[in-house]
Amino acid sequence: SSAASDVYKRQDLDIYTGVAYGLKDVIIDQWIATHKEYEKKDAKTVYYLSMEFLTGRALGNIIINLSACKEIKEAIEELGLDLNVIEDQEPDAALGNGGLGRLAACFLDSLATLGYPAYGCGIRYKYGMFKQKIVDGYQVEVPDEWLKNGNPFEVRREEYACEVKFGGYTRWVKGEDGRERVVQDGYRSVRAVPYDLPIVGYGNNVVNTLRIWDAEPVQHFVLDSFNKGDYIKATEEESLAKNIVEVLYPCDDHYAGKELRLKQQYFFVSASVQTAIKKYLDNHDDVRNLPEKVVFQLNDTHPTICVAELMRLLMDEYDLTWDEAWAVTTKCCAYTNHTIMAEALEKWPIELFSKLLPRCYQIIEEIN
């Protein structure tokens, strides 16, 4: 009966979850040890910035890389179950779509297996692209709810949450030291919260990190608006934040879609660069030496706002001059080109870009 089959499906899902959490316990110790080793060696770290990471299912990959296949297969078979059926309970991580994302995932695998310090940095999409259904012989696109049962391998890192600002205007202010600095006012902001996923190297006890960012409102619920009967305004900030992480490549043949894509790109780049600089400054004093320990690898055009954002942070937050910031930025950013097709090389209307990212637009004008 269908009720009985639902029970068996649930049982398989519960066993998958149990195996995943058991493996995660093993991985966590290696994960911590890996990062302690990198810190001890003061190793240079690559941050691989990409809109996509097509990692596939984690469980099977982790079992192989830990060389634990025989033991886990035997344990599962003792329960009268099939490891392949258990692995099938895991949804594909809806974090990528094509070659761009597969390349990113392959690089992360390879970097971990070779023992290089590396972070993948991207977005924790709620739905990814879409799930295909065929109805009456035609494709129907439905949301891919890959996170509906949670992701047992992810770790929420609240302590690394940071603010990302959109819109507003810039003005110059003179500090107590007499130097003029740019500040941004009248902006709207969202809170970027990272979720870390383990990238397990093959047979070497190395566990690197894929850090995917979720967007949350700075204030979840405005009680004052709700009490005045403005129910939409009460949750407006939440809606604005959640839109950023709903889908990979939202439709951009209208203004709102273009704006959302640019928001997505700036959101994860700003959060990743902010945390990379803070991590560097935990153990080093002079941000001008950043290129000795940090490099940002930009996977195609989507994360290239990194150049302007790094300049912005170095000048406006860390008080470097233009020339000092430029010397750091040119040594810190590397780029992977995927295509020269005109339609794939992104362009943004100046009016949209300057309104959404006013300070980055000023910096790009100055670079030009």
Locations of the language-model features?
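Conserved oxyanion/phosphate-binding beta-strand-loop segments in alpha/beta enzyme cores
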Residues: Y21-E87, S225-N243, F267-R288
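Compact, glycine/acidic-enriched structural inserts
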Residues: L66-E87, P91, K131-Y160, N227-Y231
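Glycine-rich phosphate/pyrophosphate-binding loops
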Residues: F107-K131, T321-M341
